[in-house]
Amino acid sequence: RAGIEIFVTGGVGGAHRGAQQNFDVSADLEELGKTNVTVVSAGVKAILDLPLTLEILETKGVPVLTYGTDEFPEFYTRSSGIKVETVVNSPLEVASIIKSKRDNKFDGGVLVANPIPEQYAMDRKAVDFAINKALKRAKKDGISGKNITPYLLKTIVEITGGLSLEANIQLVKNNAALGAEIAKELANL
């Protein structure tokens, strides 16, 4: 055990599109289900099956908190159309939930979905177009399994002319700032 309570990333892994047939589900979900860590991300990577990923997290008892919105963010975009039950509006509120979970000895992680800042958010139709084009290329090129995520992300950067990479950089910075504030509040509780 490393004792890391807050972990920041761009987007968590999850169930790939078609996971009902090929069972391609990221180990991120298994870890969140059993490891006492709070992950701050811009949601789930947009290339994944968001509803299925959220269902798996619910099944594993992982609280999903959205920061400042009642809609689950979709990585490059601020919204996915998926409504969530638990909205948090301050780092202190997140820290209080983490502390309550810890004090009550509930094992497993917490996912804090923090939308990309509006000025860096991409157009949802453009993102969907890039993802669908990348998925078609992957199928044509025979890419699957552990190679699919890096292939898709690289291809999406090419298709978007680098806009997705810039969005990714900005959302990680945004998540790091929120994660630091949550950690500070948690240390003071």
Question: How would you name each of these model-derived features?
Answer:
Residues G13, G68-P73, A113-Y120:
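Glycine-rich beta-alpha junction loops
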Residues Q20-E58, P91-S96:
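Active-site glycine-rich loop that binds ribose-phosphate moieties when present
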Residues Y76-D103:
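Anionic-ligand binding region
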